[in-house]
């Protein structure tokens, strides 16, 4: 992993480690470095580290975009849910934005997400967890979400990728 000398313990975190300069990334790297130095198993999947921009609407991202997935040799499958189709977003009067999920068409593996929506900084964590656990687009589509909530848009984007959406036109 990043910050790990060949065959040695993970020993770099935060500003001296590669990748984006995010406080939550530095904290996770620090914990992994301490565990590694102590001889404990330490793993950190950098693909599952989310980022957020606190604008209006917020922006959340984790993992790969469709273009990054293509460049990495995947055959991407993409699903999108516009927030204007979200009942909860409509009740907030904040229906600008979308949830977009990216997966691998061959395996269904969840590769990333981009969210532009109210509370995107909160919503993106579900996809980070999915990436960390090796979830598929189908796993996300099959996860029952409370109605009406903003997080339903993640499930609906997965359903859209699988051409099973009921609140949007399928891709």
PLM-predicted stretches and their roles:
Residues 24-48, 74-75, 133:
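Internal hydrophobic alpha-helix adjacent to the cofactor/substrate pocket in enzyme cavities
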Residues 1-36, 122, 130:
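FAD-site-proximal beta/loop scaffold in flavoenzymes
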Residues 9, 24, 46, 145-147, ...:
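Histidine (H) residue identity feature
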Residues 49-53:
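Helix-loop-beta segment of a Rossmann-like dinucleotide-binding subdomain
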Residues 38, 54-171:
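Flexible, glycine-rich terminal cap/loop adjacent to redox cofactors
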Residues 5-8, 47, 135:
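Structured loop/turn residues at beta-strand edges in well-structured enzyme cores
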Residues 18, 46-47, 86:
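Short beta-turn/strand-loop junction motif enriched in small, turn-promoting residues
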């Amino acid at each position: 992993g990043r910050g790990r000398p060949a065959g040695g313990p993970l020993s770099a975190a935060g500003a001296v480690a590669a990748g984006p300069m995010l406080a939550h990334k530095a904290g996770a790297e620090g914990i992994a470095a301490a565990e590694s130095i102590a001889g404990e198993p330490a793993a950190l999947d950098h693909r599952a580290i989310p980022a957020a921009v606190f604008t209006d609407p917020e922006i959340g991202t984790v993992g790969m975009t469709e273009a990054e997935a293509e460049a990495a040799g995947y055959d991407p499958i993409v699903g999108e849910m516009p927030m204007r189709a979200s009942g909860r977003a409509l009740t907030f009067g904040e229906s600008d934005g979308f949830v977009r999920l990216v997966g691998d068409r061959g395996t269904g593996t969840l590769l990333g997400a981009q969210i532009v929506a109210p509370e995107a900084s909160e919503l993106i964590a579900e996809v980070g967890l999915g990436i960390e656990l090796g979830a598929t687009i189908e796993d996300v589509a099959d996860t029952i979400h409370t109605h009406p909530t903003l997080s339903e848009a993640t499930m609906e984007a997965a359903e859209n990728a699988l051409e099973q959406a009921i609140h949007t036109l399928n891709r």
